[in-house]
Amino acid sequence: MPKPDIHPNWYPDAKVICNGEVVMTTGSTQPELHVDVWSGNHPFFTGTQKILDTEGRVDRFMRKYGMGSADAAADEKKTDAKNNNKDNTSKED
């Protein structure tokens, strides 16, 4: 005999929310689904280019490979100088 009450609740009209707007409804085990990208704003379907920056990874890449602005290069030099000072103080101990 199967166990009773082990299945999750089913919401046949679950709302899919993207950027604060309800974009579609679907069936799900959660009443609301929050998404960053859906077919209505995905670059493949819209034909536009959009950079999806997750946790500053694009900025870090730009700084690392010198594709950023002059301010980013100056910030990188400051960070390198701080790291060198930390290395020098740890070697003296």
Swiss-Prot record:
Keywords from the UniProt entry: Ribonucleoprotein, Ribosomal protein, RNA-binding, rRNA-binding
- Specify where the region named Disordered lies, as residue ranges: 68-93
Q: Which GO terms describe its molecular function?
A: rRNA binding; structural constituent of ribosome
The keyword Transport is annotated on this UniProt entry: no
Residue ranges crossing the lipid bilayer per the database entry: none
Task: Name one matching Pfam family.
Answer: Ribosomal_L31
What GO terms in the biological process aspect are recorded for it?
A: translation
Q: Coiled coil located at which positions? A: none
List, alphabetically, the InterPro entries matched.
Answer: Ribosomal_bL28/bL31-like_sf, Ribosomal_bL31, Ribosomal_bL31_A, Ribosomal_bL31_sf
This chain's function reads: Binds the 23S rRNA.
For this entry, the protein name equals Large ribosomal subunit protein bL31
Source organism of this protein record: Prochlorococcus marinus (strain MIT 9303)
